[in-house]
Every structure is written in C-alpha cells, then in structure tokens.
Amino acid sequence: LQIRWSPRRSVGALIALCVLACALCVSTYRVFGNFWDEPEHIAAGLVLVDRGQYLYDNQHPPFARLLAAIGPYLAGARLHGDPNPIGEAAGRDLLYHSPASYDEILTLARLGMLPFLLVLLISTWSWTRRWYGEAASLTATLFLVATPVILGHASVVALDVPVTAMSMLTLYVLLRWFEAPTWRAALCLGLSAGLAMASKISAIPFLGVSLAGLLLLRAVLLARAPLSWQLPRRIGTAAVALLLSVAVLLGMYGPRRVYLTDAQHTPSRSLDFLAGSHGVLHELAYRLAAQVPLPLGFKMVPLSILGVEFHNTHGHNSFLLGQTALNGWWYFYPVALAVKTPLPLLLLGLAGLALMAVRGWRTANLYRLAPAACFASILLFACLYSHINIGVRHVLIAYPLLAMGAGNLIVTLWQRWRSRAGHAVLAGLVLWEAATLAFTYPDYLAYFNLIGEPHPERILVDSDLDWGGQDLRRLEKVLAVRGVQQFWLGYRGTADLSREPLPHFQSLLPGQPVTGWIAITLLTLQENQAGYGWLDRYQPEHVGKSFYLYHIPGN
C-alpha cells in the first residue's frame, strides 16, 4: 500500500472489481428459482411500463421495479386482459406463461439490478477516494465486493441494493454540496435524492437522519473552527435540490394523469395527506383536485408513505434467537449485523469508523467524520423506530460504510506498522475477507459468519436464510437423483409448484406427523414451531440453505 496508484491504475482496478462482482452475481442466477418478492416486483414494474398503472404493493416506489421490468418487457412478457389483483399471482403468470422461458424472464429481470450494484461500488470508491486516497478507496471497494450479503441481494430482484446504492450516492453528493454549494452540486443532489426515494421509501428517513447528524456536527465544528457557510447561496441551492428530488420521485410513476377525487369530494387518503383532513387548504385542495387531473405520482407517493407507516405501526411477524414477535426488538439489527457480516469486515470496519470519528473530531473535519456519523445515525434510527424486523437487508447501507472504515484502517495500519509480521496480519485479514466469497458460493444471501454458524436457523430466518424456498431447484435435483416418487412438502414461497418438475406431493400440515419423504423450508418451520416440533426427533439432510429433507420410515 506504499504503491503510488495512478488515476488510470485506480480506475482499472475499480473496473476489474465491478466486473468480478457482476460476474459472480450472474453466475448464481441458474442456481436459484425465484425468491419471495421477485414475481410481484416484476409484475408491478411491467404493468407500469405497459399500461401506465401502478397496482401492486404500492408502499414501494417504482424505480427499481421499472429497471427489472424492462428486460422482460422487451422479451415479450405481457399481462393479458385485466391484471390479476394479487401481485404474486400476476408475477407467476409472467414467469411461467410468457413467450420467453421462466429462466429467460427471471434472468432479464435480475440483470436490471446490476446497474445499482455498479452505482454502489462506484459511490463507495468515489467517497473514500475523495477524502482517504486511492489505496483506501480500492481496499474499501474490495471489502464491499467480498461481502456475500451484498452480492446475494444484488443477484435478486429486490429493492434493498437499489436503495442502498442510491442513498450512498446521495450522501456522497451531499458532502460535495457541503464543500461547495454550486448549482451543479444542487442538481446532482436533487437527482440522486429523488432516485433514492424512488427506489424505496426508507431512503427518506435514512437520508433525513444522516443529514440531521451532519448538520449537527457542522454546527458544532463551526463553533470550534469558524468557516464561511455562504447561507444565502445554500438556501437557494438546497431549495432547488429539494424541488428536483420531489419532481423526480413524482415523475417516476409516469405521465398518466388521474383525478384525486370526484365532484362529490369522495375522501382521498392522498389528498388528506397532502392538504390535511380539514380546514381551508383541505377544502381548496378537494375543489381543485376534482377538476384538475394530476400526475399519478401525486396519488401514489402519499399512499406509499402511509403504507410504510401503517406497516411499521402494526409490525411484522419476526424471528430472532428462537423467539417470535410482532413488533420486533430494538437489538434486531445489531444482532443481524453481528452474524451476517464477515468477521474481518465487522472488526476492521467498526474500528476504522471509530478511527475516522476520532481523527475527524480532533481536526474539526466534517468530511472525515461523515461515514461514522451516517453509520451511527442510520443504525440508531433503525433500532429505535423500525418494527419491521425481517432481515439485515433493511440496513444494507451499513456495509459500504463499514467497508470505508475497513479500507481506511488497513491503509493506516499498513503505513504505521513497518514489520513484516504486521503486514502479514493485515494481508491475512484481507485474504480472509476475499476467501469468504469462494467458501460461501453460491449461497451469498444466506451467508452467516462463524458467530452464526453452525445453526443460523436459531438466530435469523426470513430473507437472511430462507427467502421463499430459493433452493427449490436443488430440491428437485435431489429428489430426482434419489428416485423419489412421492413426498410431503411444507413450502412457503411464490413459485408455481404445479409448473415445477416435482414428484407427486401432498402438503405437510402442522400437527400431523407423517412418514416417508418430507421436504420443508426453514421459513415454514420457523413460522409454526409447535406444529412441526415432531420433526425435531429426526436428523434432516440440508438441501441448499432453505430446505430440510427427511426420510422417516413407517412403523
């Protein structure tokens, strides 16, 4: 790391890492059938592309879904007649009944996620490079590429890598705007923030708490080391960035215009969100909305925010450390990060972020403090506010920030430690991180570190280990090799089992012990531990990470 990296060499290394990451993701496509959310995401995007309607699970905005739908749309995938009112069913129709094959449609949709992976890697590299140098930026990017959870979720049609990528880009551009509040910086900030919010609504609180933390630090640091804040210019450029971000978010739903109410002023949740539930503004908004059609985004964005708020308020069935709960646990995400993060990244990342914070505070340098401040702000918000505890994927943004900390610490220690033994230790940690990809391939999404093994199913399940029986294809092959003619199946997922090459099967119901061949997903077991507790007496065979296979002889 004493090497003087030229800009050309640095960019070349970045390109190589990006190509490697994308190649590893693509190589897993044929291993796994569809994960739980993939059919609905594809259907939602395709209906918007084809018909200008946004129908399914509208708590999620459409940007990532649109990119997932473009490939299948160009391959001829369409929903004929009135779309199925259930998004999962509509998605299954597209996967199994399109001119292109199931594999082609699913692959084309998943390829739509790779641009977000590239944005994530480039943003992490650019942010680290700007304030920590070439060596730290490449080391950080290497750590991020070697994080199985990142590659696992980038290989699936889901919204978590997209929102992580666009939020990282927005935070980087925000710091550039802090440096110099130019109109160009404001336009870039507005565009990236709009795309982040259009990827997933969680970008709003993540960016909000990060901005609040950075502004608080800025105020404290200004008191210690006064600098010109250029307040009038900042207000103007910030207003432009805010308006542009809202316009991008609204425009992502397309040009279709709708009336938010009618002549009878039928109650509208969107209008009530925008103008209040009573008062002069409420009355005026209803009169105008009954006569003037507005872009579809004015209807859908409020519904998205209200949907997420409702979901969070009412909670979601969650599992952690053998316990289930509806409203989750404040410590869910720290535990999830502790068992889902490669140990070199976890240890070096946390220590590196702490080093960044100490150095930034001592030198009154906001830009060196920023990664640690954003990490702490987002994780604290998730712990205190979120009741939707269904996977580390909801805080994936922690990983690029940890990678920045790890990259900075490796370079700092390499330069301080002159001994070969010290350099060997650091090189060993980097190699350990990189080797994780080889040892866990292709089960990146279901990765657990040494803390979580050998029984990860006792710690986390939903979308961390089993996300809709993703190993169904592996099960099909195992049953074929064993010559199984019939079996019992306990399955929680969204594949069309009638279209899969499975032997004859019957549903495995809870509380009804049976004999013969039994296949059951870990999510099925976790959601009804009492009903399937009788299986604990038998030793299963693992099929991938999401299925248990039993053979129980009759009496």
Task: Label every PLM stretch briefly.
Residues 111-131, 169, 173, 354:
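Transmembrane-helix motifs of polytopic, lipid-linked glycan transferases
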Residues 280-285, 313-321, 451-555:
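C-terminal luminal/periplasmic domains and tails of membrane-associated envelope-modifying transferases
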Residues 17, 140-145, 172, 193, ...:
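Short helix- or helix-capping micro-motifs
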Residues 10-16, 81-92, 124-146, 179-188, ...:
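Transmembrane-helix signature of polytopic, membrane-embedded enzymes
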Residues 170-186, 220:
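Membrane-interface transmembrane helices that cradle and orient dolichyl/undecaprenyl
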Residues 336, 341-364:
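Hydrophobic, aromatic-rich transmembrane alpha-helices
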Residues 15-16, 208-215, 238-247, 357, ...:
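Signature aromatic-anchored transmembrane alpha helix within multi-pass, membrane-resident enzymes
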Residues 54-112, 262-326:
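Interfacial juxtamembrane loops and adjacent helix segments
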